[in-house]
Every structure is written in C-alpha cells, then in structure tokens.
Curated annotation (Swiss-Prot):
Its main location: membrane. GO terms for molecular function: heme binding. Keywords: Cytochrome c-type biogenesis, Membrane, Thylakoid, Transmembrane, Transmembrane helix. It comes from Synechococcus sp. (strain CC9605). InterPro entries: Cyt_c_assembly, Cyt_c_biogenesis_CcsA, Cyt_c_biogenesis_CcsA/CcmC. NCBIfam families: cytochr_II_ccsB (TIGR03144). This is Cytochrome c biogenesis protein CcsA.
Length: 304
C-alpha cells in the first residue's frame, strides 16, 4: 500500500527500472537474431510515461520543478534519455539503437533508486539561490543536452563495435534518416535522375550519432550561456571556475572538437567516434564526479 507521495514517486521510478531491465536483454537479442524491436520500443515508451508521471508527481509534492537534487536530476536524465532514444528510433527503427541507448536510461534510474540514501531521495525546499525562473531554463536544458550527447556518444560507441575497419563514404549528413540520393544515368534516354541508395548499418549509426550530438551540443551551449546569465544575476559574476563550470567547459570543448572534425576535416566512422566516447567519459566526470568531491555551488552533496 502506497501511503505517501514519496512512496508513489519511488514506486513509479522502480516500475520504470523494471521495464528497462526487461527491454535491455530483449534489445540485444533482437540485434543478435536480426529481428524487429517493437516490444523493446513499447517497453521504453511505457517506462518514459512512468518517468513523466514520476516527475509530475514529484513537482506537485515538492512545489518546485523536480531537478533540485541528485535524485531528481537522475530521474529527469532517465526521462530525457528514454525520450531521446525513442526519437532516434523513430528516425531509424533498428534494435541496434535500443541496444546502445537503453543501458543509459537504465543506469540513471538504477543509480537514483538504489545507490542514493533515503535522505537524498526525499523532497526538500529549494535553497534561496535556486528560487529563480532560471532554474527551469538552465538546468533542464543542460540535462536534456546531456541526454542527447550521451545517447549520441553511445551510438558512436556502437560504430566502434560494428565497424570492421570499413571506410565510410562522405555521403551521409545531418539531414535525412535513411539514405541519400545520387545521380544515375538512365541508359535508354541518357537523362539523369536521382536514385535512392540505402546507407549501411555503420553509416546509419554514424549519421544518427552526428545528428544527435549536434542537437545536444547546441542545447549545451544554450544551457551554459543561460547559466552564466543566471550566475551574474545571483552572484555578480558570469563565470567563477566552479568545478562543474570547468568540466562543463571541457565537455563543450570535446564536442566542439568532434563537430570540427566532422565539418572541417570531413572525418567519419571510427575517428570522430573515438572523440565522442571521450565526451562520454567527460560527461560522467562533470555530472557525477563533481558530486563525489562534494564542493562547489553545483554539487548535490557527498553521498557516500
């Protein structure tokens, strides 16, 4: 019997965890058997709905947007990761996407549900510095950008796993989802028409990773700028070299380097994928590592 809103919030998170725990092995089985992953998408979609209900209930329970402590931000990140996964799968409904992305949402909600003590899972009043309309603008955009960058980087990791030293042609782009068109000469009339050519699995992953990371990078930029404006309003300084700020800048630079290699150098395949995987590690340090230090304005506190 669920007697309190807190118990219902945690139960919704646990239910989403169970669904993702079921979805992950099914996704890997679908990849190995080369079958469709419709059931996996259904499980992830229902889990996302449960996370949505969890966040709404937590918002009602606490009286503020549910992103003010580590538990709430992990639940929000799980919601954003599963939503990003569903959007990417809509562009390319392959079980490889589910196999690559589902572990991230699962890891976030598992950490929130099982690794954090009850006092960090409980709702608490906002500290005065966070009682600002910038909270929703800055933190939510940063968290959604993390979700897009994490999912995009996991797709890059999938490129490294599926790549067998294949050379990718420079024919995929950030626009389009399933293939490209090339000029083909028609023998009987000599006219030129556009003929659709399907991308390989590796090219699809490479293109989807690039597009997802591009969206995440743009949102990260907006999040950092909005945070600087908020900091200036609250403390009179745009930048204070707080540990989280420093690592957010490092994260931005890593993904800026990734996009530079794609746009200016024309890299595709393994080389930019390696840069994206470095970004995956940097996000982990920026998001979780800073909290282990227990210092800085952005730290959610020491929890060990």
């Amino acid at each position: 019997m669920l007697n309190t809103p807190f118990e219902l919030v945690t139960s919704l998170g646990f239910a989403g965890f169970v669904l993702l725990l079921l979805a992950m092995p099914l996704a890997f089985w679908a990849v190995s058997s080369q079958s469709r992953a419709g059931l996996v998408r259904l499980l992830v979609a229902v889990a996302n709905l449960l996370f949505t209900a969890q966040l709404i209930l937590r918002w009602w329970q606490s009286g503020h947007f549910p992103i003010s402590n580590l538990y709430e931000s992990l639940c929000f990140l799980a919601w954003a990761c599963t939503l990003t996964q569903l959007l990417v799968e809509r562009a390319w409904p392959s079980p490889i996407v589910a196999a690559a992305a589902t572990p991230m949402g699962l890891g976030c909600i598992a950490f929130a549900s099982f690794a954090l003590p009850d006092q960090l899972q409980s709702a608490a009043p906002l500290v005065p510095a966070l009682r600002s309309s910038w909270l929703v603008m800055h933190v939510s955009v940063i968290m959604v950008s993390y979700a897009a960058l994490l999912v995009g980087s996991l797709l890059s990791l999938a490129v490294l796993v599926t790549d067998r030293d294949q050379s990718l042609e420079l024919r995929s782009s950030s626009i389009g989802s399933g293939g490209f068109r090339q000029a083909a000469s028609i023998a009987n009339g000599g006219s030129v028409q556009l003929q659709s050519v399907q991308l390989s699995t590796n090219e699809q992953l490479d293109s989807l990773s690039y597009r997802t990371i591009t969206v995440g990078f743009l949102m990260l930029t907006v999040g950092i700028v909005s945070g600087a404006v908020w900091a200036n309003e609250a403390w009179g300084s745009y930048w204070s070299w707080d540990p989280k700020e420093t690592w957010a800048l490092i994260c931005w630079l890593v993904y800026a380097a990734y996009l530079h290699t794609r746009l200016s150098r024309g890299w595709q395949g393994r080389r930019p994928a390696l840069v994206a995987v470095v970004g995956l590690v940097v996000i982990a340090v920026c998001y979780i590592g800073v909290n282990l230090l227990g210092i800085g304005l952005h730290s959610y506190g020491w929890f060990f």
